[in-house]
Amino acid sequence: QKVQAKLQVPNIGLVPFYGYIDRLDKQGNTLRVIDYKTGKALMEYRDMEHIFDRKENQDKALQTMLYCWLLEQDKPQLLSNTAHIAPHIYPVRSMAKADEVQTLVHQKGNTDFVWNEEVKAEFIEGLSTLLRELFDPAVPFMPTAVGKRCEHCAFAALCK
């Protein structure tokens, strides 16, 4: 399911985003936004700062949150009769096991993530801050401090 939207970022303008959601399904009154992953995915977070912290391995959680926002912006008709949107990861290696879909959970209290207006506002603020940093010519691009990310990166040779 292709989803797309533009985000108005102060001092930058409209920034287009798009993505392909691997699967949408309904469980009770929750619409699950599911992304298939071939590797491990950390689906725990402390707070929104944790999601945007580049020293943390939160790219999969960030991606699924982005899909929730894109879905809400681009396909609101899919959200009718839905109380919640929830990001999930489905590790491909676990597909033989029953119900191995991993829900994003909050580390405090181990509660499931709920996409609501407060979380959405925090997410948009974090995303806007990240984009302002990326577009700021005074901020140099730096290689990641997480060396494992370089293993499959097509640009790894440029950083060394």
Regions found by a protein language model. Give the residues of each.
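RecB-family 4Fe-4S metal-dependent nuclease core
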Residues: Q1-K160
